[in-house]
Amino acid sequence: SAGFYYTGQMESDARDLRVKMEWFWKSHAAATAVVLGSSRVLFGINASFIHSESVLNMGFPSGDIHAISFLTLNYVLKHMPKLKFAVLEFSPDFMWDKEALFWSPVYKKSPGFKYDKTHDFWKDSIPKGFVELVEESYKPIAEQTQPYSYDEFLMPSNGWGRATVVHDTMKYELDDDDVDYNMALYKFVINSLVEKGVQVILVVPPQNPGYAKTGAFGIYAGRRSHAEELLKRAAKLNAVMMDENKMGKHDYTSSMAYNTDHLSREGAKQLSERLDSLFVDLQK
């Protein structure tokens, strides 16, 4: 099971994570910045546009705070000795996610993650030949139907399109155990990083500016008033806020978008270059 993070029985989301785990074990010792979150940062932040730091992007589809927490506490903090910056996605419309929704099924079906856990995530030493085992494990082949490659994770420009909302915004309340738990988890993860001398940046990826004309924050709902309150709470955490969505009042044009909540190559360039400048500013 060593190094087998993905099997053919797992959801497609886990394929991208399998690729990211190989990247992790190959570059954990040298990387100075890590990015964690969902497909919004997977496609929205790209190391090729960042020059001030050596960036490892661990974003993958459905990578909510539960996945961010697991990867940070068990891998990032144990195996990234040169880490200066951790960039964590903060998307208010994910704040109602339960662990059982996305992360638990990935973890439960992954022999590699469970194997790592039985060895305390190799915190004392990584076994000889381990990276080779990860490399040789079941490897997904980029499907011709998917618009990106596993080499670069950049999307073509399709435009923002319609500001569609998948869930009923009235279904979600701010006074909610999941919201409270997820906010507490953000606080714990951020403080754990800061204690190790890592600066944390909370990035809010842009979505379709058309949501400003609806009652929803974004594609997965969440009322706009609730999102504003969640952003205020996030701003009180021990992290630098990088709000690129600005409640829809941003400057990411339609040519910078792949769809209603993902950036294209052009958008990724703008976001990544801004992050690069922020890295530089934070070290002045």
Range-by-range predicted roles:
Residues 1-32:
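N-terminal secretory targeting modules
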Residues 190-218:
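Active-site segments of SGNH/GDSL-like serine hydrolases
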Residues 69-73, 179-187, 220-230:
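Well-ordered, non-membrane alpha-helical segments in soluble/globular domains
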Residues 187-201, 230-241:
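A structural motif corresponding to the C-terminal end of an alpha-helix
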Residues 256-284:
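Histidine-centered active-site loop/cap adjacent to the catalytic His
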Residues 90, 99-199:
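Secreted/periplasmic serine-hydrolase-like ester/acetyl group-modifying domain
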Residues 36, 40-120:
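Membrane-embedded segments
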Residues 209-243:
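Substrate-gating cap/lid alpha-helix
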